[in-house]
Curated annotation (Swiss-Prot):
The keyword Kinase applies. One of its GO terms (molecular function) is acetylglutamate kinase activity. This is Acetylglutamate kinase. Catalyzes the ATP-dependent phosphorylation of N-acetyl-L-glutamate. One of its GO terms (cellular component) is cytoplasm. It comes from Bacillus mycoides (strain KBAB4).
Length: 255
């Protein structure tokens, strides 16, 4: 069984992370080898508005022409990545920040010409991640990738799923500001790919949770053992290394 865990933290969560989150990362690190992938959407939006550049998304993906890609790269690889690295180290968690173009870490296939420099993960150079982890660092990855010497923006959920699949990770953890997937106000503690599809069809899962569960299902199909959706502002990791939230597994129909 793989002992890797990938933690995905969206850009909207980065400013909400508190001591509890970092304590949970410490608990996970005692049991597993941890990789963190982050987003940066709100800061990118703010910087684009400062530059009088239109913020545009299609099907949940940021339309990324060259001038937008330059700002995406600046934010994700610069201030956002380094802020998270410094916060980890402030809590005595040694971390190294890098992007998917460093060491050819994340190679991508372009999604479509219509949305510009946006790619989906096609290959992960896991040797770089494993090398950093073996030196007791937590890799902190900005979701930028490369294709034919061009830099591409990657949806952070897709980047995390791709990395988790390449590592055959034990678990992919999505950090959110809710306790997990909720149905009629109650937490769904365990679910699977069949029930997830039903939840989407019935409108139980909406908005920003949809790309997360879609990435979760994709990573399960690629070999990740389970996916958890947790509240990053609460204690989501037990001392056993198990997560408190919604756990999604493959092919166990519990409906």
């Amino acid at each position: 069984m793989s002992d890797y865990i990938v933690v995905k933290c969206g850009g909207s969560m980065l400013d909400q992370l508190n001591d509890v989150f970092f304590d949970c990362i410490k608990k996970l690190q005692q049991k597993y080898k941890v990789v963190i992938v982050h987003g940066g959407g709100p800061e990118i939006d703010a910087k684009l508005k400062d530059c009088n550049i239109k913020v545009e998304k299609r099907d949940g993906l940021r339309v990324t022409p060259r001038e937008v890609m330059d700002i995406v790269q600046m934010v994700l690889c610069g201030s956002t990545n380094k802020k998270l690295v410094m916060n980890l180290q402030k809590h005595n968690l040694l971390a190294v920040g890098c992007s998917g173009c460093d060491g050819n870490l994340l190679q991508v296939q372009p999604v479509s010409k219509e949305i510009g420099y946006v790619g989906e993960v096609s290959y992960v150079e896991t040797a770089l991640l494993k090398g950093l982890i073996n030196m007791n660092y937590i890799p902190v990855i900005a979701p930028i990738g490369i294709n034919e010497n061009e830099i591409y923006n990657i949806n952070a959920d897709n980047a995390a799923a791709g990395i988790a699949a390449a590592l055959s990770a034990k678990e992919l953890i999505f950090i959110t500001d809710v306790d997990g997937i909720l149905h009629e106000g109650k937490l769904v503690k365990k679910t699977d790919e069949f029930e997830i599809d039903t939840f989407i069809e019935k409108g139980v899962i909406t908005g920003g949770m949809i790309p997360k569960v879609q990435a979760a299902l994709a990573s399960l199909k690629m070999g990740v053992q389970k996916v958890s959706v947790v509240n990053g502002t609460k204690d989501f990791a037990e001392v056993t290394g198990e997560c408190i939230g919604t756990t999604v597994t493959k092919g166990v129909n519990i409906v």
